[in-house]
Amino acid sequence: NEFTGLLADPQTVSRFEHIVFDTAPTGHTLRLLSLPKAWSGFIETNSHGASCLGPLAGLEAQHEQYTATVQTLGDAARTTIVLVSRPESSALQEAARAGGEFRALGITNQHLVLNGVLAAPAGDDGVAQAMVARQREALRSMPEVLREVPTVAVPLMAYELTGVAALRRLSRTAEHTSLADSAASVSAAFDVGSIPGLDELVRQLEADGPGVIMMMGKGGVGKTTLAAAVAVALAHAGHRVHLSTTDPAAHLGQALGAAIPAGLQVSRIDPAAETRRYSEEVLAEAGPLEEQERALLEEDLRSPCTEEIAVFRAFARTVQEAERDFVVLDTAPTGHTLLLLDAAQSYHREVERTMGDVPEAVRRLLPRLRDPHFTKILLVTLAESTPVQEAERLQADLRRAAIEPFGWVINASLLMSGTKNPTLMQRAQGEVPYVLRVRQKLAARSWLVPWYASIPTGEQALLAMAGR
């Protein structure tokens, strides 16, 4: 609503030369804006809904404003969509997916910003050379659709881009930051070697016995690789382990490589298949409907909220296995989803409204997630401002749902890399306050995982990552 108000209101638009949004609406939201006026009254009285269309009920009067918004977004002379990505494979795939959603809606004026590109190092620093090689390989293999988009590269800065002063410095390319004594500052801050690593985390998990291990955190922080490393290490120790993902990009297969270690079962919760199965059940339960009602219910069921509920049911079935085995999940429900499900009875009412009964696995899920002996939630972050802030918000969401995280994993840290590259040395120094904040204020337990020159792939590399 606020978005359309800014974009479609002539008085607001006339006050500014440029209006910059740091986040665009999703393709699903834009599709909802183009729904016919008829949906409004139907959703208000719909007893079959399983999605988040409800809050839009009664907004029929603003339909013209929504239509104008979609038209403005599709006008290349007035709107530019800027896709922002790190020079990493997973981030580039996500940028391509988001761009495709907008193109399907006729929003084609797109640009790509590659953020954090490291310049080719002049010296022989192995860490810097490896980082440049990884970035170049990601750009070589990036989705073809992004190659057609005008692209700008923003260099990896020695300092973090937080605060007005730092943002102004970004535009002053001739300005250089003093790097004197960077290494000394890093080592003097604290003894990095005293912070436990992934090997210690695996030992703690193993000692506590079977249960659920959930990786949660911002996209792109390395949840999939960490989940794979933990699962492979536990299987290598002789335990039965089920590693599951809801990641549509199948990053888990890339992390594990071709061979699956003995004792490890790998599965994928397919959101599309689960949503299809759930939607069919809802439609069957709804019974005979008029053509318009059925069409609107079907659109209702295309909502991301429907997918959340469907995936949540599959997630509950997987968690049930942890009574006897280790179950490692590389992508858990978001804190927002868990908050929506905070009161178990609310979710039960939703299921009863759409299905008539509550599966036993679902009924027992929230108590299991709240049991610290059964479920270990690991918040994964990078030692940077935004990932730490997002993990902190996620922790607050979980706590409001009476779920206490087991600890935090700080991933891909340059502190232990041994780099002598000036830019990377200062980046390492910049990690210190975030590592200290996590360890001293945010986390009950924390572990530090170094940045790796090559992405750990396959059983041996993952075992080495876990100290086995």
Each language-model region and where it sits:
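Phosphate/Mg2+-binding loops and adjacent switch elements
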Residues: 1-97, 288-386, 390-393
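Short, glycine/acidic-enriched loop or turn micro-motifs at the edges of active sites
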Residues: 25, 118, 248-250, 333, ...
